[in-house]
Amino acid sequence: HGIFVGESRRTNRNGIRQLSTYLDNLEVKAIKTDLLHLLCGCSYLNHKTMVIAPELVSPGLFPGFRFVTIPREEAYAADALYLGEGRVLVPSGFPKTGMKLRKAGYKPVEVDMSEFYKGDGGVTCLCSPVYKLF
């Protein structure tokens, strides 16, 4: 078991090392990115499935995963949040992403993010998800 952490201008190697001391029972894998956050280009959904903008984050970094790939022009929608029971919170206005999610068996739940977009905020910037770890 493990987690992926984006190594970026926001989260450096020292921060990742500190995080790994608190998660000593999990493998912490750093993924170098030029994005502000790794979530700007991909998000974990469930069952080893990710939504990903492959022009921003290489799917090859995540061996063994399945992908819902979205086009570059809708890359903002890669910052998504899995809500459970197949529902995925996504920004509104990205019809290709919604279609691909539905085709993959998910139910997109759209929310207006237009004001947050102006400040580079995505869906996951508005929440602090807590997952059952054990």
Regions found by a protein language model. Name each.
Residues 1-134:
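Histidine/cysteine-enriched polar flanking segments
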